[in-house]
């Protein structure tokens, strides 16, 4: 089946790989022949909520590779990123960026940076936010806080 784009990019921390991350990655592979994955460096995540609980880069990288292998995704490149723009201005042949509704603003920033360098802006492919069984978005922050699991199920706390 012919893909819509030759080269697409997707980025994130991909901490405690959850249903939202998986939906984002699946969409990237659905629309792109080659998927460039920007994985945030440990330095970049220091300002995130519960940053002390974010898994180290190497562990997140291994978890990401495991997901890609289990799903038999082959045409990808994982690159460490140190800021929101990452390598998107260095690979001129990128055609699209895959984001969630929540991270759409990041795609706009990427396109602004590309346009400032005279590069073609990327088409923006947006997936909806994946909701937990509690009705809130599934996020690594909620998983790190111990409120939900990676599938969006609430974690029952022992009553004291």
Swiss-Prot record:
Keywords (A to Z) from UniProt: ATP-binding, Coenzyme A biosynthesis, Cytoplasm, Nucleotide-binding, Nucleotidyltransferase, Transferase
GO biological process terms held by the UniProt record: coenzyme A biosynthetic process
tRNA processing in keyword set: no
Pathway(s) annotated for this protein in UniProt: Cofactor biosynthesis; coenzyme A biosynthesis
Swiss-Prot/TrEMBL catalytic activity: (R)-4'-phosphopantetheine + ATP + H(+) = 3'-dephospho-CoA + diphosphate
Enzyme superclass (EC): transferase
E.C. number(s) listed in UniProt: 2.7.7.3
Gene3D superfamilies, A to Z: HUPs
Major localization class: cytoplasm
InterPro entries: CoaD_Thcocales, Cyt_trans-like, PPAT_arch, Rossmann-like_a/b/a_fold
One GO MF term: ATP binding
GO cellular component, one term: cytoplasm
Compartments it resides in: Cytoplasm
Keyword check for Transmembrane helix: no
Function as written in the Swiss-Prot or TrEMBL entry: Reversibly transfers an adenylyl group from ATP to 4'-phosphopantetheine, yielding dephospho-CoA (dPCoA) and pyrophosphate.
Family from the record: Belongs to the eukaryotic CoaD family.
Alphabetized NCBIfam families for the sequence: CoaD_Thcocales, cyt_tran_rel, PRK00777.1
HAMAP family referenced in this protein's UniProt entry, alphabetically: PPAT_arch
Identification of the protein by name: Phosphopantetheine adenylyltransferase
Lineage: Archaea, Methanobacteriati, Methanobacteriota, Thermococci, Thermococcales
């Amino acid at each position: 089946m012919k893909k819509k784009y030759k080269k697409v990019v997707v980025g994130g921390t991909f901490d405690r790989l959850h249903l939202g991350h998986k939906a984002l990655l699946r969409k990237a592979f659905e629309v792109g022949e080659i998927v460039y994955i920007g994985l945030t460096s440990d330095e970049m995540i220091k300002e995130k909520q519960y940053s002390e609980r974010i898994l180290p880069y190497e562990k997140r990288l291994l978890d990401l590779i495991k997901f890609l292998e289990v799903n038999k995704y082959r045409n990808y490149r994982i690159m460490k990123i140190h800021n929101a723009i990452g390598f998107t201005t260095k690979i001129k042949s990128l055609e699209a960026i895959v984001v969630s509704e929540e991270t759409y603003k990041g795609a706009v920033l990427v396109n602004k940076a590309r346009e400032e360098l005279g590069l073609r802006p990327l088409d923006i492919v947006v997936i909806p936010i994946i909701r937990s069984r509690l009705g809130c978005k599934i996020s690594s922050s909620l998983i790190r806080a111990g409120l939900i699991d990676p599938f969006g199920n609430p974690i029952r706390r022992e009553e004291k």
